[in-house]
Amino acid sequence: MCIRDRSNFTVFKTNHHKKHFLRAVLNLPSMLLYFSALVMMPIEKATAISFVVPFIVTILAVLFLGEKIYIYRSFALVLGFIGMLIILRPGIIEISLGVYMALASSFMWSIVIIITKTIAKDDSSITILSYGYTYMTIFSFIIALFYWQTPSFQTLIYLFFAGLFGTLLLSLIHI
């Protein structure tokens, strides 16, 4: 399969094969953990827990990318943390498997963001997305072999239109 972007370079040309692979290896379980957390806890709690991502990304960016934290970013992080605490109300939220899943998902997603930033210096967005989707499709297929349940015809219709409208909306971004 040969896909080309607008600059006529092949999309799969990269010097970061291991990073793309690692990104996908972390991205898929991150999503699976988050979706599992949504089943086990209210959506507002899972979403509030996911707001820890900017804090983790900032710490990782300082440690691994050498980025600096300036006063405005620090202020925004503190406000975000306060907002997260208001939503979660520490002491009231029950610590459960869902909470741990949401936290693990957030940590993995933070690493994915850092890896993406390092790859984005050399690879185009299309290359990053192509590798991510290719690897995740392969990994998802392997998982599906063990857990596949054929959707009903009505569900297939819904999925078709969700894909169609999602693709149309995303294509409008590039017009």
Label each residue range with its predicted role.
Residues 4-29, 108-112, 131-146:
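Transmembrane alpha-helices of multi-pass small-molecule transport proteins
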Residues 8-33, 97-105, 150-169:
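Loop-to-transmembrane-helix transition segments
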Residues 36, 53-75, 147:
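C-terminal transmembrane-helix exit sites in multi-pass transporters
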